[in-house]
């Protein structure tokens, strides 16, 4: 995994980008200042919109022109619906800090989000578990509907409309990259052609257009990727009774992880990763059968064996003898009573990682640069982490009067984020594979590993600190 994700350096400037009809390097005849931007962000999803917001609210970008291209229409949430959306994100404290920096987090808190203060992860094939919490019961993270985040970002984009222009229902169809060396009759910027024929120029193009990124493909950047033989089923669930509901639950089943994320005292969001065939069955089940399947997945011990349970108990006793301190006790998740109508959907899962995040006048962020399995709950947080890093380097460059598209600071962003993202992708992929088998030796090793990790508080704190970024 790590070897496949290793960074492949670029040999010749945009040599690969000259393949295919969508990309060209041609001479430039000149352009109006009206269509020249300092930064163009391609893709107006959560990460792209947040990137444009962050730039628009940065003091060193007050005299810059920023453009956000979004292929879809403007999403307006005039009134918060009573029913919760089935598409939610787990927001880390680090991501909440980023959203707070430009005012979006206040909007989110004034609408609705749910903090969780503990997270319990356990194995369906043994009694092994790990409990993440904080001694002072600080928030570990927040479960927020994607529509709520998008509404908050839209509000903050409107607040900086003087700096940030948003073109909805607009999509780039081709790019012209600048020559690697300055030429008197060529443009030094990236040239973008939109679907309606309009042309734009930018000193820096930021690709935030998802895991099938057109920007990445047009630039000829290699993407290491594969599809897992899994789909994720998501749904909005009603609990059997009202609870404090501040724990995020995740259980590793042989077919894939199932997670229950708190939305309110009586509601939780389901993310169940399983085989394509089983996922299709879950979506088509009658409601009562579906609810029974969820409760069984969280409560049943059908995959346990006496040998594994005995071996796990021996290690647990040894740990308790050597370290007679408080050990996290296994808690029982809440039972599910029913599911919101029409909230069940599925989507395929996979992994992806761009060999390069940057080229001259180009940076990739979010899913355009990396795609991760949802078991870690880090997808959007990785994208927001990209924003924090890129914003830092671009803000410093703007303050010093540097060229925003220069590799001198773009490379620093790439180094920073590839180091973090590659480690997280590799760890997530390893966990997915480690928990996808019932082989006795593997189950025993992962049982002992989980128990040992749960007993070492400093190690758990390091894991939480890494995931909180």
Swiss-Prot record:
Its EC number is 1.14.15.45, 1.14.15.46. GO terms for biological process: ubiquinone biosynthetic process. It is a peripheral membrane protein. Disulfide bonds: none annotated. It is found in: Mitochondrion inner membrane; Golgi apparatus; Cell projection. Its cofactor is FAD. It catalyses: 4-hydroxy-3-(all-trans-decaprenyl)benzoate + 2 reduced [2Fe-2S]-[ferredoxin] + O2 + 2 H(+) = 3,4-dihydroxy-5-(all-trans-decaprenyl)benzoate + 2 oxidized [2Fe-2S]-[ferredoxin] + H2O; 2-methoxy-6-(all-trans-decaprenyl)phenol + 2 reduced [2Fe-2S]-[ferredoxin] + O2 + 2 H(+) = 2-methoxy-6-(all-trans-decaprenyl)benzene-1,4-diol + 2 oxidized [2Fe-2S]-[ferredoxin] + H2O. Keywords: Cell projection, FAD, Flavoprotein, Golgi apparatus, Membrane, Mitochondrion, Mitochondrion inner membrane, Monooxygenase, Oxidoreductase, Transit peptide, Ubiquinone biosynthesis. GO terms for cellular component: cell projection; extrinsic component of mitochondrial inner membrane; Golgi apparatus; mitochondrion. It is an enzyme of class 1 (oxidoreductase). InterPro entries: FAD-bd, FAD/NAD-bd_sf, Ubi_Hdrlase_CS, UbiH/COQ6, UbiH/COQ6_monooxygenase, UbQ_mOase_COQ6. The keyword Iron-sulfur does not apply. Pathway: Cofactor biosynthesis; ubiquinone biosynthesis. Residues 1-28 form a transit peptide. GO terms for molecular function: 2-methoxy-6-polyprenolphenol 4-hydroxylase activity; 4-hydroxy-3-all-trans-polyprenylbenzoate oxygenase activity; FAD binding; oxidoreductase activity; oxidoreductase activity, acting on paired donors, with incorporation or reduction of molecular oxygen, reduced flavin or flavoprotein as one donor, and incorporation of one atom of oxygen. Belongs to the UbiH/COQ6 family. Component of a multi-subunit COQ enzyme complex, composed of at least COQ3, COQ4, COQ5, COQ6, COQ7 and COQ9. Interacts with COQ8B and COQ7. FAD-dependent monooxygenase required for two non-consecutive steps during ubiquinone biosynthesis. Required for the C5-ring hydroxylation during ubiquinone biosynthesis by catalyzing the hydroxylation of 4-hydroxy-3-(all-trans-decaprenyl)benzoic acid to 3,4-dihydroxy-5-(all-trans-decaprenyl)benzoic acid. Also acts downstream of COQ4, for the C1-hydroxylation during ubiquinone biosynthesis by catalyzing the hydroxylation of 2-methoxy-6-(all-trans-decaprenyl)phenol to 2-methoxy-6-(all-trans-decaprenyl)benzene-1,4-diol. This is Ubiquinone biosynthesis monooxygenase COQ6, mitochondrial.
């Amino acid at each position: 995994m790590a070897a496949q994700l290793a960074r492949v350096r670029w040999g010749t400037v945009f040599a690969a980008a000259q393949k295919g009809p969508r990309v060209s390097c041609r001479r430039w005849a000149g352009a109006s200042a009206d269509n020249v931007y300092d930064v163009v962000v391609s893709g107006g999803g959560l990460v792209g919109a947040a990137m444009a917001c962050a730039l628009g609210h940065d003091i060193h970008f007050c005299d810059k022109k920023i453009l956000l291209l979004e292929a879809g229409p403007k999403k307006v949430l005039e009134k918060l619906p009573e029913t919760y959306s089935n598409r939610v994100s787990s927001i880390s404290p680090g991501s909440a800090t980023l959203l707070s920096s430009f005012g979006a987090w206040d909007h989110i808190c004034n609408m609705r989000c749910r903090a969780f203060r503990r997270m319990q992860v356990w194995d369906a094939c043994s009694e092994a578990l790990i409990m993440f919490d904080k001694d002072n019961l600080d928030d570990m993270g927040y479960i927020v509907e994607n529509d709520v985040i998008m509404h908050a970002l839209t509000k903050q984009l409107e607040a900086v409309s003087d700096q940030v222009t948003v073109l909805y229902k607009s999509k780039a169809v081709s790019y012209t990259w600048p020559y690697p060396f300055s030429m008197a009759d060529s443009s030094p910027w990236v040239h973008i052609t939109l679907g309606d024929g309009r042309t734009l120029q930018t000193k820096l193009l930021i690709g935030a257009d998802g895991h099938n990124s057109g920007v990445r493909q047009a630039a000829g950047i290699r993407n290491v990727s594969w599809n897992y033989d899994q789909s994720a089923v998501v749904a909005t669930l009603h609990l059997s009774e009202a609870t404090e509901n501040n724990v995020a639950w995740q259980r590793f089943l042989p077919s894939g992880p199932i997670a229950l994320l708190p939305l309110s005292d009586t509601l939780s969001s389901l993310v169940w990763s399983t085989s394509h065939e089983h996922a299709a069955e879950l979506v088509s089940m009658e409601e009562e059968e579906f609810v029974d399947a969820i409760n069984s997945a969280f409560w049943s011990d059908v995959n346990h064996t006496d040998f594994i349970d005995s071996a796990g108990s021996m290690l647990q006793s040894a740990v308790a003898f050597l370290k007679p301190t408080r050990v996290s006790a296994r808690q029982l998740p809440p039972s599910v009573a029913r599911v919101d109508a029409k909230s069940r959907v599925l989507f395929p899962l996979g992994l992806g990682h761009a060999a390069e995040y940057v080229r001259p006048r180009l940076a990739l962020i979010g899913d355009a640069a990396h795609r991760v399995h949802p078991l870690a709950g880090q997808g959007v947080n990785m994208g927001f982490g990209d924003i924090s890093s890129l914003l830092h380097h671009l803000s410093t460059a703007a303050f010093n009067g540097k060229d925003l598209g220069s590799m001198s600071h773009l490379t620093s962003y790439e180094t920073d984020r590839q180091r973090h993202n590659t480690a997280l992708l590799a760890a997530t992929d390893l966990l997915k594979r480690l928990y996808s088998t019932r082989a006795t030796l593997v189950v025993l090793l992962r049982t002992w590993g989980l128990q040992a990790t749960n007993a070492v508080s400093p190690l758990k704190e390091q894991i939480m600190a890494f995931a909180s970024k």
